Amino acid sequence: MNPLTQFKKIPILPLLIALALVVLAAAGGARAAISDFNGDGHPDYLLENANTRQTAIWHLNNNVFVSGAYGPTLPNGWVLVGVADFNRDGHPDYVLENGTGQTAIWYLSGRTLIGGAYGPTLRSGWVWVGTADFNGDGYPDYVLYTATTRQTAIWYLSNNVFVSAAYGPTLPVGWSFGDFCDPWDYGCCL
C-alpha cells in the first residue's frame, strides 16, 4: 500500500482554531493537523505515522485530495503536537514535544526542514492544547491546560522564545478539552 494513501481510511476530525492547529490522535497510531502548506488558500492535512515517525502532507482543494508529499521524519521520543508559522515566513512550522515537556519548533519551507529551535518546556501537569496569536503580535502563542484544576493558560511567545504568561478561563466542572486519544472527539472542544 502506498504510504501517502494509507491514511485515507483514518477518521480525522480536526478542529481549526484561529488558523492554528489542534492535533488529534487517529486510529492506527497516526496523528493529524491542519494548515495551508502549499499556499493555495485551502487547508491541507499534515499526517504523522507514529510507527515510522514519517510525516506526510496532503494537499486538498476543499474536501478533495489533490496530491501528497512526505515531510520530515520525526526523531524518536518526540511527537507532533501542532503547526503554526512561528518565524513569520509564510510557511507552517511543526511544533514537537517530548516526554519531558520540552517543545521544539521545526521551521519549514513547504515540506522541507530548514532549521529548528527549542521552545519553552511545559510545567509538570500541564498539556499543550494548541496555538493561536492571542496578543496580536503576529506570533503564535501556546494554549495549555491542566486537568487537576481545569485551568487554562496562554504562553505568549516571540518565535520560539517565551515572553510572558497569563491564565485563561478555568473550565467548568464536567468539561474538559477533547481527549486526543479518541479519533471521534473534537480537539479543544468543551
Predicted regions and their residues:
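Trp/Gly-enriched beta-strand/coil motifs that build multi-repeat beta-propeller-like domains
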Residues: G29-L190
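Sec-dependent, cleavable N-terminal signal peptides
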Residues: M1-A32
